[in-house]
């Protein structure tokens, strides 16, 4: 009797799809409801809606590079997403410490790729600030990428520590 293989973590791509859906829904709302470059307070002294656009990457990196960066960041995001999806296919379904952050990064990366291909830029709209110190505007896809990257780093450290201890 042959053993049934463990199911892969590809089911976690449903979380990626959820991130993509929420990201695109929120950006559609922003484009139809918020004025450009105008702060709309959500929590005074901390949080605004602020519709802006980013042709670069994190913190507007390469935003003034002349247009080639759209294709560079699209290819980079698709390559990373493909690699993470491959890793998901090699990960056991129940190993959520790997699957969850991979799925978040995939969903966020693809959400921003959709923007780049549809609009030529990424739509950002969440603005956090304290006093005169303002964090660069971001979106749901960015939040998923950062959360996933933190998860990969933190859970990777814990997994290595656990393996070394045993």
UniProtKB/Swiss-Prot annotation:
Annotated keywords: Aspartyl protease, Cell inner membrane, Cell membrane, Hydrolase, Membrane, Protease, Transmembrane, Transmembrane helix
Membrane association type: Multi-pass membrane protein
EC number of the protein: 3.4.23.36
ATP-binding recorded as keyword: no
InterPro entries membership: Peptidase_A8
Family: Belongs to the peptidase A8 family.
Protein name, as recorded: Lipoprotein signal peptidase
Lineage: Bacteria, Pseudomonadati, Pseudomonadota, Gammaproteobacteria, Lysobacterales
């Amino acid at each position: 009797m042959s053993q049934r293989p463990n199911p892969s973590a590809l089911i976690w791509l449903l979380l990626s799809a959820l991130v993509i859906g929420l990201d695109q829904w929120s950006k559609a709302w922003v484009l139809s409801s918020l004025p450009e470059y105008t702060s709309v307070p959500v929590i005074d002294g901390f949080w605004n809606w602020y519709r802006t656009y980013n042709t670069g990457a994190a913190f507007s990196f390469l935003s003034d590079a002349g247009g080639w960066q759209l294709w560079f960041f699209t290819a980079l995001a698709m390559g990373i997403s493909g690699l993470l999806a491959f890793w998901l296919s090699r990960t056991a379904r129940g190993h959520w410490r790997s699957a969850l952050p991979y799925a978040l990064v995939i969903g966020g990366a693809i959400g921003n790729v959709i923007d780049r291909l549809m609009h030529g830029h990424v739509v950002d709209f969440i603005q956090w600030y304290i006093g005169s110190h303002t964090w660069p505007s971001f979106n749901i896809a960015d939040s998923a990428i950062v959360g996933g990257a933190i998860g990969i780093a933190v859970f990777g450290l814990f997994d290595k520590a656990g393996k070394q201890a045993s």
